[in-house]
């Protein structure tokens, strides 16, 4: 409650009290009489000093108008005295015998209205207080005041609110393009309806926290040009039974009155959680609310013109009935940005801030792999706060570097005092991590190593990937195991006993090894089997109270395989440190003197360290002998072998406005329909142009004679076999060309990397949390065509009347240079998984020091 509201309430109470006092004052006709004792009034009656008298029987008082005032009445001639009910006859006799000129007796009787008011008024006051308290508990009761418990709390955005557009969104270009189509459908429905297209009824934005799901919804609100209602999923859950379902009904009734419109439900997992039996046979109020939401989204009634946009970071717990097409037709993953996205986000958040021209934002974008947009905004803000703390005027490279360390590891513990021996142990511990990682061939080089205490760690070593990756091989995971055990091995090698500082390293190594055995099938003994399926009661978090789906013998073998992996990594780390003991001592000496070493320093110190061979102890394929035949080469590698120049990616995708000439074929491009005859259409009906080849090196496609031998038995056939020679038609979001060798592109609307379905054994530390939420989605891979080359740049001439979401040249770029690029074969679309010893760093691998806490 603010100060203005308090002042208003106090003033209202004061006015009411003043009115009551004024009413009682002016309605009292005895205010001119002096109240005296009963004995004084009787003495005046006995002295016959009374001119007139009036007896008020109900009030049991007598009014006397005296002939002369005296000392007993303080000179007043109008006096008032009270008397008991038993003395009424005596007072009447006294007045009658006083010889007054006149006297009167008034008997006041209550009216029926007064009696009713005296009975009802206290009840009205009590009910008023009750409803006031309930109104305060319900936050105003929503629409309808006190009786509006069942009314919707959805708020309609007005023109006075700050407007966010798609130009303010950076690092989520695919999500922007998907949502822009909805905005274009609302503003230009004719060209979609001419093709029989229907607008998506629901759009689900899912992904980890801080990636911009709510920001995308605000951008849709600023661009749509239709009524926009926003509500939180928790607003449906109240203390009364049935309130949630009633609010859902009222929200959609409100939306129908403003159709066409958009409803945005933030954190829909609060109401859309998967239904279950309930514990103890009880009733869950969320189920009733969810059932009403399902009916309103796609039930018997009409819902034309209402688009529901929802956001969640827990798609795995949503009810399958809520995710089916017809309710949420489009499910858009919003993951962590890639390198180009991080560049754009840093440009947006650094706009308007005095950044030093020598500050390397490009390098900062490379060092922050896996960070979300919120993390990057926090990095820039922390750098500004650090600069202000030091009374600086320009944000320098050092401030940006320190801000990254603060966001990843926490603030420095400058006041911590440690002994020289503990400092030496920390130096060797972090040096062991660094040297082990430097000698392994399948791990990113160490970017920074420090023994400064930060957050809950006594030191850490960071590895930064050179580029974004979405896959991890077995040798890479073993290399991370070796790095994790490097600190423990250094303590045992130098000080002949381990310390508690390696607890977080052991925890990280155990997680990696167990994931290799149980999730990724990287154990030759147990095979490619997933042990420990996710499931269980949704009310128990899907993991509590659920028995393992494997036997005790398998559990014992899993433990043995995990231990063997960690022991092999421990032995390898010991061998590396023992072989390069001089380099380990040199790293420890430099850390004791300088406390922090960067990659440039490490390159000088570890110049003589050679890469170790890959560990093959666990590469047991059984009777399956790997082939010596190398994999096929990419179109880029083939072009380089032929001496041709591979074209650089274009600066931006081609966005052609409706009605523009030659909208189906870009200028200077060669129409390509896969060698099939032209049917007369200017372009594909889905709005995506066929890929074009740079001239004059476009390949000539020649038919392949005969049918290739696929190794099927003679005379054997099946539906769809043998495969057709002609390529299958493409689908929206797919590339028309495929990699030589038949690697399938990613299906549309399917997330890659960390928050999508893994491809070809992609590691997933928490695959269920941000996996594909809809189990019924299918991929439609494209059949490779012989002779087809991968295009240099995917070309999307989407015909939007206003030029599309990327028509603004200054979008996400304060300098005015348009650097947005659609993904290419050389530009991965997803960030690599985090390689962190404690599994809490958002961007880099951190191997903590021996402080005993992590």
UniProtKB/Swiss-Prot annotation:
Residues 658-854 are annotated as: Disordered. It is found in: Cell membrane. Pfam families: AAA (PF00004), AAA_lid_3 (PF17862), FtsH_ext (PF06480), Peptidase_M41 (PF01434). It is an enzyme of class 3 (hydrolase). This is ATP-dependent zinc metalloprotease FtsH. One of its GO terms (molecular function) is ATP hydrolysis activity. The chain crosses the membrane at residues 6-26, 113-133. One of its GO terms (cellular component) is plasma membrane.
